[in-house]
């Protein structure tokens, strides 16, 4: 009966709490207290005779990802904008980006006065389609941004070959993929640069934060200037009380720096990232099997993937089932059963209510530019289909145990069984 669904007044399948997020590493309280009493709360504060947490985290995160350079930044959005500007992207340049992602994947490109060219995605991985990228390249294309979405890695073999063939920088947006590997190499280290977000929901978090990693020393130096008002860190420690930032005048920038509190948290959280990722992978593999028995299709990843990172567990509803029920209603029904948010996939960026360039006067740069950035010009059938039929769970649910995965599968089974009642 319809009443069996919790969203329709029935009894919820689960009332037990789920794992909390964030989960602070053991050393976080002491590290934050150390910053609090240090007299230096940011890299622009006076040098106190000891290495900043920002430098410590940058060195640790670079080593973790197998690259020589990491520049921390204020957010994932800031990191992507810094990488774009370090590539020389600017007014009128076209930047190819997947149409299925968080809205910032498009707005960051607008933010450097460039033109986002939204491309369709692979129907199974939900990541950028190499075929769509090849078809979208024009004489105005200046870069490709690839997003490793939810828990999948894009086809970096094909995308790297396309970028190399056309002489284009390739930027990896790894905001949802900290620690994932492709052919044994950490994501972010496979392209010109990799950008990361450390926002509250991410698997590596300091509330807000970001980073750019690269193998290119000159690129890293440009990013460093761009994020610190045109300044870079001194090559040698300054005298105590002096500023560690040097005014070189090489490249004008803005303030997109990370605070010492955030850097201290990240340095500690990095020490537990691999263990948490392994827990998520094991639970996701178990859940894949349970949901597969119900005819559901968990998101897959590209063939070159060595290890996945589960920021979000995404699953497609079975074909021919609940096709007349809005995915938002299915998500609400699952949420009611589990007491844990189950959300629809991202909307395609051009259709996202948050992506409205016309509401910002800074983007009114002439009729031609306004035409080029008009979201209505893009047709993205695979993105649209994925948004209609995909639901997602935040990675905190994957920090539980096998019983928790069983509850998730049972909730899906219940909603699939009684979901027709959602139409009334």
UniProtKB/Swiss-Prot annotation:
Catalytic activity of the protein = 2-deoxy-L-scyllo-inosose + L-glutamine = 2-deoxy-scyllo-inosamine + 2-oxoglutaramate; 3-amino-2,3-dideoxy-scyllo-inosose + L-glutamine = 2-deoxystreptamine + 2-oxoglutaramate
This protein's pathway reads: Metabolic intermediate biosynthesis; 2-deoxystreptamine biosynthesis; 2-deoxystreptamine from D-glucose 6-phosphate: step 2/4; Metabolic intermediate biosynthesis; 2-deoxystreptamine biosynthesis; 2-deoxystreptamine from D-glucose 6-phosphate: step 4/4; Antibiotic biosynthesis; ribostamycin biosynthesis
One matching Pfam family, short form? DegT_DnrJ_EryC1
Regions that span the bilayer: none
Essential cofactor(s): pyridoxal 5'-phosphate
Is the keyword Protein transport assigned to this protein?
no
Q: What is this protein called?
A: L-glutamine:2-deoxy-scyllo-inosose aminotransferase
